[in-house]
């Protein structure tokens, strides 16, 4: 067995080896703190494995519930074709937290969740129009500047955060529209002008009758933690109906409680997308669809193997999520996130120097003056806590959903010292 101080040498020998300097101590990490196995230092965890760990490290209830996984851990199950009781329990549980949707597809990886939502939309649009295979490459997807939807397959044509993630790979020239992100404190007139331009660009593309989907992150993550107005979502919703396109919201990062609601789109009254992509805190990735897809009788949920994968998600992840969902309900986690998140946001507003403080629930971010200033502050923060950069000069916080007021106070003390 390797020692903690050997880990990075091994990784650099066989892989790119550019991971974080921390080596996870699985035994000693606790609650909202990640412990470095090399030094024993605890770090306040405000990245939560890129927003994938809702209940923190070694949650006592989750540890107790997961003690029985040995029977399942020794098997790798092809869940798409071989069903089991844990699979059914997971699907039932997941459907319960997404009552707006009727069809579900599960897969490994958020990118593949987005990709299969796109495939479902392409299939639906082609059959709606009565088009042939010869017309397939004429389809379009409306998407935003600064979008991040993944880095393989169709998503390469959507992601446009940093060029090194998509450059030199073949891509489709799909319609990219202006980003009407809100700057805080809100200057409504400025936002409205950009929204109007963005919506005109979207409608121009939709008028070709070749747009299969409008896709956007409910709150953009890597692109800068960018928020959009309810009016903007409502306008896109109306256009998607009018021009027969699917409205797809990418909730891979925002979903399952991070914003204080199960899905971030719930913050926008009356908004109901046709599809959502999910992952991260859901432990299993995929997409969900409303019955709008049933306007085409032989849609992807009616044709065997039209979309599929060998594993259809991992059974251990499914068992874990079933327990996570139960604990979140028992402990009223969503209400906790809303309360603690509001406190966190207000405390961030007291920090000197940082600007554009923004957030919903525990999905929080702030800006520095320049990219160089951001990087310097980031380096200081990483000495005591885990955080993530985003956009050109932003820092994003992705705490575990069990974050407390005391954790917020600790975070604010670290941030004030770092800036």
What do these predicted regions represent?
Residues 1-419:
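Conserved N-terminal phosphate-binding loop of PLP-dependent enzymes in the Aspartate aminotransferase
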